[in-house]
Amino acid sequence: MNYRELMQKKNVRPYVLMARFGLEKENQRSTREGLLATTEHPTVFGNRSYHPYIQTDFSETQLELITPVANSGTEMLRFLDAIHDVARRSIPEDEMLWPLSMPPQLPTKDEEIKIAKLDQYDAVLYRRYLAKEYGKRKQMVSGIHFNFEYDQALIQQLYDEQSEVTDCKQFKTKVYMKVARNFLRYRWLITYLFGASPVSEDRYFRVYDDQPQEPVRSIRNSTYGYRNHDNVKVSYASLERYLEDIHRMVENGLLSEEKEFYAPVRLRGGKQMSDLPKTGIRYIELRNLDLNPFSRLGIVEDTVDFLHYFMLYLLWTDEKEEADEWVKTGDIFNEQVALGHPHETIKLIAEGDRIFSEMIDMLDALGIRKGKEVVGKYYQQLRNPQDTVSGKMWTIIQENSNSELGNIFGNQYQSMAFERPYQLAGFREMELSTQIFLFDAIQKGLEIEILDEQEQFLKLQHGEHIEYVKNANMTSKDNYVVPLIMENKTVTKKILSAAGFHVPGGEEFSSFIEAQEAHLRYANKAFVVKPKSTNYGLGITIFKEGASLEDFTEALRIAFKEDTAVLIEEFLPGTEYRFFVLDNDVKAIMLRVPANVTGDGKHTVEELVAAKNSDPLRGTNHRAPLELIQLNDLEKLMLKEQGLTIYSVPEKEQIVYLRENSNVSTGGDSIDMTDVIDDSYKQIAIEAVAALGAKICGIDLIIPDKDVKGTRDSLTYGIIEANFNPAMHMHVYPYAGQGRRLTMDVLKLLYPEVVQ
């Protein structure tokens, strides 16, 4: 069958780049000094029996990070980035992920290498068998398994354009068998470009072991890596022959079970190999990628893109020998390349030239212009072995050592994970509370699907239990009407007042002129102007000592800009506190100090704001724990009330407030007060939220004196607002005080069977 012609058909070409990707990556945990960790798998990751993203491989110290299936290499790497952040921040503080395929220095005694402590006893027994049959040390090598599937739409179009095979499932299997054979034949190129295990640490090989002449390109991908015994031979001529050979090996005792068969490429269908006759081959797993220590993920996007184009090439190019001989030639070439010196030119230059030239021709024929740059980059390395991963490693190792290389990069990547611990790599454009929520969900092993990134809409799943979450705390636990109640400040006040809670008096206006005419009633009072239905403190102006008509009018203009109706309310004196109530319990209390700067007698207000905004904890759009302080109309109005402008130079230690309202979302500072506020106020908050019918709520109380016990029917407090989607990041990472992991509390509410 001429796949090259099929791939160029008009109906096929729009689909040639469509594929599905997945990745499994192993790393040993080591100390920050580069010694194999001795701790058990962190319990913070939950149960390994179901965790979809973070598992252990052979040993208790060998993490396996698993991405969900993605429709692009970029999306796959994005999730891998997030899983790395979770893994690195969750392991003990004195540990890191060892960035090399070859393990750090191993203990002298094999019994000190601990097999993974799994719940499934048969899995433990299987690892014990592998340890006895192949030795523990070979099992400690780490790498990447790259899962690749041609999109079903591409397979269907190819199938429709041919007439030799009359069943699409059989056609798909035929495609993957061809690609598998070609991969085994040409995998030497992958070993050359991406091999990254040139040397081993002391005690990896025993004195009586057969050892390579180090350095090489890839110990892991040579006969010195992990592989079956020489008497295990399997044909790739057809799926039937492949399965028959493996079955015979098991029957003859050469393999303990089907999954013991280990090859650079694995054919995948159902959950077990025995499912393949029924399911056919659904995708293939490439198992010969070493960890790239020059990437904090162990792999770079260019490598993923190259592998994608390489997989297209393997379908494009013809086989030139009988199947078993074709594969055997590939084994010989791969061994030659794997055991070559990292800085030596390979003997397969001519074949490499042909492969790269044909790949470029294929990209031209299929109209894949963007692929030529990536392919060209790696083509350049064909004659420059020092630029390959193993070549660059050997350059460093010669001047330092392999362990030093591992230590330098391992520590660097571990530190990078903590530069902005409140963000989640791969998802930094999402709201901060959602990022923290995603971190916790990944850590605990909940399956995640991002339904709408712009809307912060997530789907979580554990077994058959599915939950939908918006903005990190809008869940099925609150019914539809609850957010509508809290969105409407007039309705909120009426419900709370009817339930016996103290709320400020005031008026509602939908007409700018009518509101303006109310000025005389408030000119000499303390009052607040705010939109009727907004969150995050937008459009609010506070006048503690009355206001001129000009300022009153400006406040109305600002409020009407946010909503079609505004409220003018009495100002309640006291300190404002945000109570975060979840499931009839106060989980956190926050004192929010309005946006402010402290003078130094030298710099203007504008310059002081710029300096304070340089704090890495400050950002925009809820992607940092604190928001940038603005200098817009509201802030300038606030300065005017203090007799200042943005060009004024405040005296030393003079505190200048730029906002009257204390929302962190408008540049305020957050201070945790959970353990300071009397329980009487917590009870008031709980009862008020219950009156609104909410499970999750941020409710704002004004308290004149927190040392005086609060009572529901008194003036010891006043409720000024309730929020249906309260920000959580300011509680998790406060400006001062203890952080409260509210995102984990939400997860516990949704999945008590997972989060204990």
UniProtKB/Swiss-Prot annotation:
The ATP-grasp domain covers which part of the protein? 493-751
Q: Which GO terms describe its cellular component?
A: cytosol
Q: What class of enzyme is it?
A: ligase
Task: Identify one Pfam family in the record.
Answer: Glu_cys_ligase
Q: Which cofactor does it need?
A: Mg(2+); Mn(2+)
Top-level taxon of origin: Bacteria
Tell me what reaction this enzyme catalyses: L-cysteine + L-glutamate + ATP = gamma-L-glutamyl-L-cysteine + ADP + phosphate + H(+); gamma-L-glutamyl-L-cysteine + glycine + ATP = glutathione + ADP + phosphate + H(+)
State the PROSITE patterns in the record: ATP_GRASP
Query: Which residues does the annotation say bind Mn(2+) 1?
Result: 700, 721
Q: What is its EC number?
A: 6.3.2.2, 6.3.2.3
Supply the alphabetized keyword list: ATP-binding, Glutathione biosynthesis, Ligase, Magnesium, Manganese, Metal-binding, Multifunctional enzyme, Nucleotide-binding
Free-text comment on the cofactor: Binds 2 magnesium or manganese ions per subunit.
Q: So where does Mn(2+) 2 get bound?
A: 721, 723
Which intervals of the chain are annotated as region Glutamate--cysteine ligase? Answer: 1-338
Family recorded in the similarity comment: In the N-terminal section; belongs to the glutamate--cysteine ligase type 1 family. Type 2 subfamily.
| Annotated function | Synthesizes glutathione from L-glutamate and L-cysteine via gamma-L-glutamyl-L-cysteine.
Name of the featured protein: Glutathione biosynthesis bifunctional protein GshAB
Q: Which organism is it from?
A: Enterococcus faecalis (strain ATCC 700802 / V583)
